[in-house]
Structure formats: structure tokens, C-alpha cells
């Protein structure tokens, strides 16, 4: 058996096309241009790359975007003041503070300061709570992207046993809450395994769908999978490889070479879930601009 490759770029492009259509309609019918504000603190190279990628996506969608670049010495109060300004700016419909933040700034305080109606990352406690109880909200981008990958690739999770490996607030927990909802594209039986789970393989071998988000390179191997399962690899890890051009390469949380021989379908890294995260950010932003989520 050799798994079908689930191409995240193809599915992300489908979603972006839909967002462009929504954006054109908003501009034409209501005179609204979706606006997204990025706040970047410090000089972390990875964060700078992420913000540039997101800004480029905004341009492709026809959004208005602004980037506030702050030094790593910025105080928490100064950052809160900037967030408050964007909260009241009618031209800004989404606010994204790029994480991680410097140690002297409390991430939870910053996240909670964002108007939940502009929280396009889906991290605000109000949005987390609404997600848990099944109310409409702006959902975290990566978990929402995982659901879209499953549904649009013909691997609807309804009635399936899904094992999520990882319990982070950003990925693991929200994926669980999304896939167990009583709604189309969900209705799954969800098990979470994590670093405290004694025998992860005993759970993953039972799964129809395995979602790996544990943050450990190639931790899920082919012998840990049930033949014919679907594997979604959320991990992004850089490992040393002397044969690679730059001495390193990017891998996921799944050992692709062994898993591809067992699974029915699998996402690659790169080229899988990562493409979906930005697409779902664009979708959240246009939904926030439409103003229908919290009516």
C-alpha cells in the first residue's frame, strides 16, 4: 500500500479563491475592505517570515493590512496601548499578535486584550469557550484547517475514531473540540494522547484518523498506525541532515517514509497543514469583516 498524498496547497488555494469572492462581494455590495493588523515584537527570524507570508496573502486576497513592528524592549503597557488602538479602528477587522513574545510580556494578558470579535487567531477565552459549547466563533486557524483538509480530501471524520497526539491550546485541544461537534464535517469519536500517555502506539493503532501535533520530529512511525488510516501531520521540525543543501531539513511529527506505506492518505511536510493555516486566517478575517459571526 502507498498512501494518497493530501496536497495542502491545492485545498488552501480553493479556500483562498472562496475568500477572494467573498472579499469582492463585500467591496461591491457594502463598500467594506477586510483589514488585518499584524503586531510583530522583536527580531525573531521565523516570526518575520511568518508575518511577511501573511501580509503577502492579504495582498493576494485584496485585503488592507498594516504591520506594527516593535523592538523586543517594548513594554507590556505599550503593546496593550497599540492593541487598544486597533480594537477601535473601524478599518481593522482582525488583529494578530505574532507569538512567541519576549519573556517580560504575558501572552495571556495580550491575547485577552484583543477584541474577541477581531481575534482572527481564535485564541481569546471567549472564542475558546464558544468553540467548546458549539457556538459560532472565530476558530483557531490550524485546527480549522485540519478539518477542512479532511473534509475536502474526501476523508470526512464523521463517525470515525480520531486520535490526536498532542494537547496544546493552539492545536491539540481545539482540534478535539472542533471534530467532536454535532455538525457536518465533525461528529467524530476523539481520543487525545500526549506526553503523559504511557503507550501512545496502543491508541494510534486503533485510529481511523491520526492527527500528529506533538512537536517531536518523526515521533509517529508506520508501525504505530492501523493499515488504511488517514494521517494528518501538523508538526514542523528542523533536523540536522549533512546530505541536505543547508545541513538540515524540515520534517513533521510523523516518519513519512514508513507511514506512507501503511496509511490510506497522508499530508506531507512541508506542503500539507502549513498551507492551510494562512488560508484559514484569511477566511477568519473576511468573516470578521462581514460581521455575522457574533450577531
Task: Report each predicted region and the residues it spans.
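Short, well-structured alpha-helical segments in soluble
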Residues: 78-90
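Glycine-rich phosphate/diphosphate-binding loop of Rossmann-like nucleotide-binding domains
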Residues: 41-55, 137-230, 234, 244-260
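Short beta-strand elements in bilobed, periplasmic/extracellular small-molecule ligand-binding domains
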Residues: 36, 58-72, 186-192
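Short beta-strand segments enriched in small/hydrophobic residues
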Residues: 33-42
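Rossmann-fold NAD(P)-binding glycine/threonine-rich loop
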Residues: 107-124, 128, 235-294
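Positively charged, low-complexity intrinsically disordered leader regions
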Residues: 1-30
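Anion-binding alpha/beta catalytic cores of soluble intermediary-metabolism enzymes, centered on
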Residues: 96-162, 203
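Short glycine-rich, flexible loops that bind phosphorylated cofactors or substrates
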Residues: 103-104, 218-220, 239-240
Amino acid at each position: 500500500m502507498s498512501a494518497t498524498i493530501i496536497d495542502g496547497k491545492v485545498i488552501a488555494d480553493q479556500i483562498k479563491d472562496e475568500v477572494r469572492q467573498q472579499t469582492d462581494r463585500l467591496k461591491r455590495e457594502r463598500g467594506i475592505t477586510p483589514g488585518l493588523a499584524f503586531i510583530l515584537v522583536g527580531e525573531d527570524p521565523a516570526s518575520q517570515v511568518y508575518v511577511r507570508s501573511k501580509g503577502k496573502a492579504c495582498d493576494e486576497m485584496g485585503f488592507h493590512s498594516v504591520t506594527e513592528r516593535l523592538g523586543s524592549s517594548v513594554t507590556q503597557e505599550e503593546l496593550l496601548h497599540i492593541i487598544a488602538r486597533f480594537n477601535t479602528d473601524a478599518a481593522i477587522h482582525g488583529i494578530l499578535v505574532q507569538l512567541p513574545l519576549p519573556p517580560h510580556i504575558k501572552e495571556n494578558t495580550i491575547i485577552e486584550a484583543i477584541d474577541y470579535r477581531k481575534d482572527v487567531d481564535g485564541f481569546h477565552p471567549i472564542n475558546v469557550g464558544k468553540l467548546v459549547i458549539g457556538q459560532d466563533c472565530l476558530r483557531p486557524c490550524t485546527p480549522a484547517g485540519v478539518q477542512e483538509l479532511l473534509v475536502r480530501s474526501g476523508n470526512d471524520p464523521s463517525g470515525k475514531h480520531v486520535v490526536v497526539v498532542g494537547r496544546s491550546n493552539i492545536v491539540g485541544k481545539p482540534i478535539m473540540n472542533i471534530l467532536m461537534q454535532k455538525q457536518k464535517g465533525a461528529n467524530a469519536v476523539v481520543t487525545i494522547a500526549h506526553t503523559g500517555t504511557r503507550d501512545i502506539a496502543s491508541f494510534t493503532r486503533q485510529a481511523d484518523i491520526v492527527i500528529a501535533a506533538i512537536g517531536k520530529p518523526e515521533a509517529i512511525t508506520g508501525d504505530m498506525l492501523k493499515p488504511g488510516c488517514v494521517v494528518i501531520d501538523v508538526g514542523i521540525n528542523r533536523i540536522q541532515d549533512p546530505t541536505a543543501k543547508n545541513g538540515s531539513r524540515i520534517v513533521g511529527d510523523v516518519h513519512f517514509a514508513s507511514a506512507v506505506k501503511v496509511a490510506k492518505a497522508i499530508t506531507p511536510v512541508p506542503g500539507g497543514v502549513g498551507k492551510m493555516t494562512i488560508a484559514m486566517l484569511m477566511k477568519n478575517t473576511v468573516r470578521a469583516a462581514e460581521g455575522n459571526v457574533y450577531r
